[in-house]
Amino acid sequence: MLNLCHALRGVRQFSCSVIVKVKCASCSIKLQDQDPSKPGYYTKPKSLPDSKLNPDLQDLKYLLFSQDIQLSKQAIQNDPDLKTKRDLLLRVICKRCSNALHHNNYNPEEFPESTLNDILNYVPRGSNVMHIVPFVEFPLHLDPNVLKRNDLDTTLVLTKSDQVFKDKNAVSKKVPIFMKQFLKNTLRIDSNKTFAISALKNWNISMFYNYFKNYTYLLGNPNVGKSTLINTLLQKYLGYKVKIDSTGKINSPSEEVMQEAFTNPKNFFKIQAAGVSHIPNLTRSVQAYQVGGKILFDLPGYSTSTSRLRLEEPIDERWLQRLRKTDLFNRKHIKQKTYESMKGTSQGGCYTVGGIFYLVPPKGSINQIVKYIPGPSKTFKNIEKGIDVFNSCNSSSGTHPLSRYCGIKSVICEKSQYKRYAIPPFIGSIEIVLKDIGYILLRTTGRYEFKGLHEIWIPRGIQVGIREPLENLIESGYRRYIETNGKESSCPRDRPIISSLYEMAPDEADTLNAVKKSYLEKTEKDLSARRFVDDDPYDLVQHLXKKKNPYWYYQW
């Protein structure tokens, strides 16, 4: 405590008038200490152990120790000559963020979702926008409404590419060519403004920096990698937070704060960094950053569906953290592609990761599964058995022998809480993508013979889709493009490569005909997308080598 007093000697008293002008260092909301029910609230201690402490040290003790103990201790040790209150204020976070980040104690209702229109209120017409989409979950998160806007100059940025590709060669050269042709063929968007990057691996970050213009906005769903990208740029180009007033004047940190960039760069970055968290919707207000000679704006994430399920409801807290913390992703699966085998059974044998989904292969099929979702997998005799086991796990408070395989809460331990989806016919391999969760590769082996449709059961409200294996699709397409000197597209034109799934009634027996019926309904206003509508479904699936991906259709 004596060291703290010495370090903070001469610092003037904090006041409410100062605090309300300061933003939370994590979520960028304005701080206030008047109303606990309103955003930005931070609390002061009700009583102090030492009444002799003067008010300024009381406030400082609270702000530095009550909210962010580890960060503040290190900051004081590394910066014993701290002289200004401004750099102390930059460390302050609101009560909501403090509880969520340091105690993992948060109410999802305090992290409200925003719509695209809500977020666009921050963005002036004609602005430069980077639409941030995690490539690992492509095509989920890709919003054509953003790319097609005439009042914005939009570039598509595909993040987390290290979770799809082995090295950055494909990311640098092959992805932009593929995406240009995909956007043109699929969405009728003629654009060559696409970047694939990995902020964690520093792939293409220099190229990205050289490309983006001054006053650029980062726009995307929650947890797509916006803040991680910003922090990578801040470290690489010695960036920092700035404030821009109503006249457009840029207010940079004080000289004392900027001096720390040279005397203690590690601590300087901690103060300036964007708030990165596994908690969605953490960012609540726009935050500007000076990155080199350019201004970059971090926008709150927006959601495209009001009916979307909050993953906090069905999924266990520890499992959810593993799903969302992308730095924990194990890249050995990308290089080795270790698979698990499973044979379809007459009882409806299923494969699951934590109960988050149940994959049911058709009877007699031999399948290989490569899992890119954290957590141990498990097979069960049928879905009912899996749900029954996980129900017992939730009732046993962790003592059940299979508790390590359980990633769901008791609220989802009923079959009625899941939706049944049929996967349209395919031959070879596909990737099944679950929004905000990850993906698995599914491969059927042996001589092709149609044995039925694969099914997947997923909690209601979770979005799912399929795609042809992305890495192989882009690699083979690039080879074809180069070998023909660009005459052939790197993105296939003879078939769709992505598709939504088809919801089935729990008792539907003829899933193939039900899929065709649903396909015709979904494409009623998109007749140009229809294929094989005159073929009998059961004749069609006998010739998948020639008539690929029947009934594949993605609803944007």
From Swiss-Prot:
Q: Which residues form a coiled coil?
A: none
Q: Where in the cell is it found?
A: Mitochondrion
Alphabetical keyword list: Mitochondrion, Transit peptide
Transmembrane stretches, start-end:
none
Any one Gene Ontology cellular component term annotated for this protein: mitochondrion
Q: Which Gene3D superfamilies match?
A: P-loop containing nucleotide triphosphate hydrolases
Instruction: Tell me the protein's name.
Output: Genetic interactor of prohibitins 3, mitochondrial
